Amino acid sequence: MAGAKEIRSKIASVQNTQKITKAMEMVAASKMRKSQDRMAASRPYAETMRKVIGHLANGNLEYKHPYLEERDVKRVGYLVVSTDRGLCGGLNINLFKKLLADMKAWSDKGVQCELAMIGSKGVSFFNSVGGNVVAQVTGMGDNPSLSELIGPVKVMLQAYDEGRLDKLYIVSNKFINTMSQVPTITQLLPLPASEDDDLKRTAWDYLYEPDPKALLDTLLRRYVESQVYQGVVENLASEQAARMVAMKAATDNGGSLIKELQLVYNKARQASITQELTEIVSGAAAV
C-alpha cells in the first residue's frame, strides 16, 4: 500500500485538476449560452432562405440553374465543420465516423470524395487518414463571421461550377439541446426538392428582376453560404454543450476519485498508527 504522504499528494493533485475542470465547465456554460443566442439569431434567416429555395426547387422555372439539375455522380464534395479545440467528448469523432461511413458508401460505387475543412480537428484527422483535403480554415474563435468561411465555400462552389464535383454536402453537428448533439450530413447541391407538404401544395409565380440567371446565381450562392454559416454556429453551440458536459463528468469523477483516495489514506494512516502502537507495546514489554 502506498504511504500516507504519497496518497496526500495524489489527493492534492486530483483536487487541483478538479478546480480546473470546474472552471472549464463554467466557462463552457457561459459560451454555450452566447452560442445559442447566435444560433437562434441566424436560424430565421437560414430557415426562410431554405423555404424560398425549396419553392424554387419544386417550381417550374423558365431558367434552369445548374445548381438545380441532377448529374451523374463521379465526384462528391463535403464541407466538414469540426472544432478547433478538444475536450468536448465524442463530438468530433462521432461526426468523423458518420462521414467516413458515407464516404465509404460512395467509394464502393467508384465515386471520389473531396473535403473542405472548417476547424483544425477535422484537418488533422483527415490528413492523418489520407483524406483528400482541398481547402481549410481554422482558428475562427468563438464568434465566427461569414467572411471567414468564404474561402472553403468558394473553392467547393468553383469546383461544382467547373464540373469537378457533382454533389456537395455540409457535415456538422446539429444542436438539439444541452445533452444531445446529432452529427448530420445535408445535401447542398444540387438543390434537393423540398419534402415539406406545404411547399408542395403552394405554387408560387415568379417575377425576376433584373433577369432569372443573375438573380438565381446570387440567390443560390447566398443559400449555400447561409447553410454553411448556420452549420458552423450550430456546431459551435454543440461544442460548448459537449465540453460543459464532459467537464462536469470529469469534475464528478474527480470527486469520486478523491473519496476513494481518502479511504485509502485513512486505511494507510490507521495501519501506521497500529504499527507504532505495536512497537511501543513491544518495547515496553521488553523492558
From Swiss-Prot:
Domain of life: Bacteria
The keyword Membrane appears for this protein: yes
Any GO BP: proton motive force-driven plasma membrane ATP synthesis
Presence of the UniProt keyword Oxidoreductase in the record: no
Any one GO cellular component localisation term in the record: proton-transporting ATP synthase complex
Assembly with partners or alone: F-type ATPases have 2 components, CF(1) - the catalytic core - and CF(0) - the membrane proton channel. CF(1) has five subunits: alpha(3), beta(3), gamma(1), delta(1), epsilon(1). CF(0) has three main subunits: a, b and c.
PANTHER family: ATP SYNTHASE GAMMA CHAIN, ATP SYNTHASE SUBUNIT GAMMA, MITOCHONDRIAL
Family, as annotated: Belongs to the ATPase gamma chain family.
Name by which UniProt lists this protein: ATP synthase gamma chain
Organism this protein belongs to: Salmonella paratyphi A (strain AKU_12601)
Name of the encoding gene: atpG
